[in-house]
A protein has these predicted regions:
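N-terminal organellar transit peptides
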Residues: 1-135, 141-239
């Protein structure tokens, strides 16, 4: 009687490094298949996932909407300036909308955004929601005349710039002169956008001054108080 050897059974679901025979005598390289599968899973698992909030902002950017919803700093300014340049390059005629809910922040970062808003050929519509304070107020009124909006419960805060000063007596003098220069520059820009006099702006911004949406409209920070997106003309916030 001839000796017949039987292949060792492979436990279901177990993939080893050894080769196994199929019914046709072909060799199935199960170890290689398992390695390939694991690598494929690893590639999918290790792929960076964009945070949900960032995904929303990126989708809004496709509709030419920029959100300024944090304190104004250098990183935010660089991002918004880049987005303005990108949207202008894609279409130099369609409006760009900036929604503002910000407590303010760095004067120089804000001035970078301001200059870029004036630099691009597009009309830049601004929308105040929540709070547009300090540099947020400055950027709000810098929108294209006739396209500056406030939602009903938005609050606007205007005040003079502030900052710490230190060092030698000579350094303190230089820093104080620079702060006065910045204060006057901001007052001139706000006066130009609101129709108020520079003297009036400097007087009103000497201390914190709050405005309701309607008061902001009367003062010249915005042109319209809106309660619904339907009140915005066709070239509106999301086109």
């Amino acid at each position: 009687m001839s000796d017949v050897s039987h292949p060792r059974p492979v436990a279901p679901g177990v993939l080893g490094a050894d080769s196994a025979h199929d019914d046709g005598g072909r060799i199935a390289k199960t170890g290689q298949t398992a390695t390939t599968s694991r690598l494929a899973v690893a590639r999918v698992t290790d792929a960076p996932v964009m945070p949900f909030g960032e995904q929303v902002f990126q989708r809004l950017l496709r509709h030419r909407v920029i959100f300024l919803g944090t304190q104004v700093d250098e990183d935010l300014a660089n991002r918004i300036c880049a987005e303005l340049v990108l949207l202008a390059a894609e279409d130099s005629e369609r409006d760009i909308s900036i929604y503002i809910n910000s407590p303010g922040g760095s004067v120089y970062a804000g001035l970078a955004i301001y200059d870029m808003m004036q630099y691009v050929p597009n009309d830049v519509a601004t929308y105040a929601m929540g709070m547009a304070a300090s540099m947020g107020q400055f950027l709000l009124c810098a929108g294209t005349t006739g396209k500056r909006y406030a939602l009903p419960h938005a609050q606007v805060l205007m005040h003079q710039p502030s900052g710490g000063i230190g060092g030698t007596a000579s350094d303190i003098t230089i820093q104080a002169e620079q702060m006065l220069y910045v204060k006057h520059t901001l007052a001139e820009r706000i006066a130009m956008h609101t129709g108020q006099s520079v003297e009036q702006i400097e007087t009103d911004s000497d201390r914190d001054r709050w405005f309701t949406a309607e008061e902001a409209k009367d003062y010249g920070f915005v042109d319209h108080v809106i309660r619904s997106a339907t009140e915005v003309p066709s070239e509106g916030p999301v086109s």
